[in-house]
Amino acid sequence: MNKQNNYSDDSIQVLEGLEAVRKRPGMYIGSTDKRGLHHLVYEIVDNSVDEVLNGYGNEIDVTINKDGSISIEDNGRGMPTGIHKSGKPTVEVIFTVLHAGGKFGQGGYKTSGGLHGVGASVVNALSEWLEVEIHRDGNIYHQSFKNGGSPSSGLVKKGKTKKTGTKVTFKPDDTIFKASTSFNFDVLSERLQESAFLLKNLKITLNDLRSGKERQEHYHYEEGIKEFVSYVNEGKEVLHDVATFSGEANGIEVDVAFQYNDQYSESILSFVNNVRTKDGGTHEVGFKTAMTRVFNDYARRINELKTKDKNLDGNDIREGLTAVVSVRIPEELLQFEGQTKSKLGTSEARSAVDSVVADKLPFYLEEKGQLSKSLVKKAIKAQQAREAARKAREDARSGKKNKRKDTLLSGKLTPAQSKNTDKNELYLVEGDSAGGSAKLGRDRKFQAILPLRGKVINTEKARLEDIFKNEEINTIIHTIGAGVGTDFKIEDSNYNRVIIMTDADTDGAHIQVLLLTFFFKYMKPLVQAGRVFIALPPLYKLEKGKGKTKRVEYAWTDEELNKLQKELGKGFTLQRYKGLGEMNPEQLWETTMNPETRTLIRVQVEDEVRSSKRVTTLMGDKVQPRREWIEKHFEFGMQEDQSILDNSEVQVLENDQFDEEEI
């Protein structure tokens, strides 16, 4: 892979300083919550991956140390250890100057996904301390930094070595990451596993040395993205073996793997130089365009589509498709839309992917004739179902059919008085009794109430036309008013927030999961925008005294309960709420609906693959994966009165005081 490129001191280019990083970290790592925290690790890992991507080294070890710091070690060439043309040691330039990287101007890399150097300096700026150890040219070098990037030592030669590579250890700064500086093994695992899937020869080890959390996992996939697709489809009924294509066009390397399952949603994961492009881009467009064109040509050739028939829509062809599209693009062609590298803008990538897929897919379809015919028939059925769903939507939206909508919502929805969609909230409330209290206790101006009476369908297993037949889901679709599935338009939503409010028991949790499954599958932009919430009613009410001296307090956790019991002393009465219906309207407003005092959990999708796999595991047809997951993640000795707040993985937003970076 272009080994003549010279990764040396002079190949590191300096573009600008580091001043703004600590002041505005969100601009560089997205946020200072746990996503931003883990992003620090990815920046350093991506630098190590770049070495492997360009043919140097094949191992990366990531270790969460006992003191909460983290180490990333590779066996690449090792960072340059000489003096940079600016007069400073090159290592110091890499770790203290923003945009000092080996990728700029093609100095050290043909293809690069990490910002190689940008990442290193940003991580240093946001760390309490950072140390780098380099094995290069037979010597071991060491340099340390502290207090957000200031060198605390020069580059020191420590001894001799036969190895090559770089080891970076850092401890995040808790004055920047105020919520937590604790790394989550599972979050890191998903991302590292992804990197291993994308590079066949890469071996990654993840270690956790923290007391009580000791754990180790290895990731190495000889069949690369073929195994990635199998991993994503785990727990689903698949229709064939994974298909893979590789090729090169316009100097861009293209790898594609795909497999159909029996479900109704598509999952396309795209990558550029091993970095996930979660918002897609030109490479994804090229894949979809070629696939749609080739499938339609094939359908006409085998006479499943007649001359008079219109072409199959891409959405119908991709129903039940899981695909991974990975491209490697030379630096001079690489363009992203926006700062976060989440959407590819390189125009040549579209034609490159289109060319490779259009060249290879027809042969695959001819070779697998029986399967191909069944996939075409599947797409035709999807087209028919989509047409039926479209007609149902049009019926619901057209003026002449408004009576049906009014009938559907009659006696159910209690609307907000305001028409301000930027402020209005929709409460989905379990049961009639709680719905009644919510109607009386709400702020009529901006809060709408929709009680859920019947059974909510499990949308993981249902197709769109069946979902429309479920009264509860249909009512939610009409109430939100922004469409559903591929036709969902978030800007048309009648509400800024959708808040799920259920009892704090097993049935309530089940309703939450059913609703979240629906939102994740069919109104995903609403979840991605952070506009779906779970209301958190209190578990306990404590009351003491009478008349003017009467004091009423609420507790959401056992910890809060114990604190209040000590504070109130003897003589209080304690009520354990079993359901929302036990609260009168004033109590429900005060504890669960008042923006000044309520507690909400914002539902967020941090990792698309992880979220999708969890939904399949928990809501799919197969019992065994669900049983194994539950046994691994839940203690069945839990007391009935334990709260969701006791889960350290749940981030809670209290009193509606959202951080600017969380919104």
Curated annotation (Swiss-Prot):
Gene name linked to the record: parE
Q: What is this protein called?
A: DNA topoisomerase 4 subunit B
Q: Where is ATP bound in this sequence?
A: Y7, N47, D74, G114, L115, H116, G117, V118, G119, A120, K341
What the entry lists under CDD domains is as follows: HATPase_GyrB-like, TopoII_Trans_DNA_gyrase
Q: What class of enzyme is it?
A: isomerase
Q: Name one GO molecular function term.
A: ATP binding
Q: Superkingdom of the source? A: Bacteria
What is any one GO biological process for this UniProt entry?
A: chromosome segregation
Gene3D superfamilies annotated for this entry?
3.30.230.10, 3.40.50.670, Histidine kinase-like ATPase, C-terminal domain
User: Would I find Cell inner membrane among this entry's keywords?
Assistant: no
> Where does this protein hold Mg(2+) 2?
D503, D505
What does the UniProt cofactor note say?
A: Binds two Mg(2+) per subunit. The magnesium ions form salt bridges with both the protein and the DNA. Can also accept other divalent metal cations, such as Mn(2+) or Ca(2+).
Has UniProt tagged this entry with the keyword Nucleotide-binding?
A: yes
In which residue ranges is the amino acid composition biased (Basic and acidic residues)? 387-398
User: Its function?
Assistant: Topoisomerase IV is essential for chromosome segregation. It relaxes supercoiled DNA. Performs the decatenation events required during the replication of a circular DNA molecule.
User: Where are the annotated segments for Disordered?
Assistant: 386-418
The UniProt keyword set, sorted, is:
ATP-binding, DNA-binding, Isomerase, Magnesium, Metal-binding, Nucleotide-binding, Topoisomerase
Q: Origin organism of this chain?
A: Staphylococcus aureus (strain MRSA252)
Q: Which reaction does it catalyse?
A: ATP-dependent breakage, passage and rejoining of double-stranded DNA
Q: Where is this site: Interaction with DNA?
A: K455, N458, H510, R626
Membrane-spanning intervals of the chain: none
Cofactor(s) for this UniProt protein? Mg(2+); Mn(2+); Ca(2+)
Binding of Mg(2+) 1: at which residues?
E430, D503
Single GO cellular component term: chromosome
Pfam families assigned: DNA_gyraseB (PF00204), DNA_gyraseB_C (PF00986), HATPase_c (PF02518), Toprim (PF01751)
EC number(s) reported in the record: 5.6.2.2
Family classification? Belongs to the type II topoisomerase family. ParE type 2 subfamily.
